Amino acid sequence: MKTIDPRHYDVIVAPVVTEKATIASEHNKVVFKVASKATKPQIKEAVEKLFDVKVKSVNTLVRKGKTKVFRGQFGSQSDVKRAIVTLEEGHRIDVTTGL
């Protein structure tokens, strides 16, 4: 049985299921919300170990938080870091199923 480092679960926070992410999945790409301090090598290692796939490349982006007004009260959204993971040919991840 393979052993998974518990820190990998801290790197990958959640899959992103949006229209744009669904279109990217047709091109062998998967989008994850990741920890803000996570680096590309950490993300690559976590995805390879957790999902048992080979990663070709990792691209990251940070969506800056915004100030919003809700019922007259000001609030702020946090920054969100996303990783677009490109998988090798023949590898797939189904994000609708759990780990």
UniProtKB/Swiss-Prot annotation:
SUPFAM superfamilies: Ribosomal proteins S24e, L23 and L15e. The keyword Transmembrane does not apply. PROSITE patterns: RIBOSOMAL_L23. Keywords: Ribonucleoprotein, Ribosomal protein, RNA-binding, rRNA-binding. InterPro entries: Nucleotide-bd_a/b_plait_sf (IPR012677), Ribosomal_uL23-like (IPR013025), Ribosomal_uL23/eL15/eS24_sf (IPR012678), Ribosomal_uL23_CS (IPR001014). One of its GO terms (cellular component) is ribonucleoprotein complex. GO terms for biological process: translation. One of the early assembly proteins it binds 23S rRNA. One of the proteins that surrounds the polypeptide exit tunnel on the outside of the ribosome. Forms the main docking site for trigger factor binding to the ribosome. Part of the 50S ribosomal subunit. Contacts protein L29, and trigger factor when it is bound to the ribosome. This is Large ribosomal subunit protein uL23.
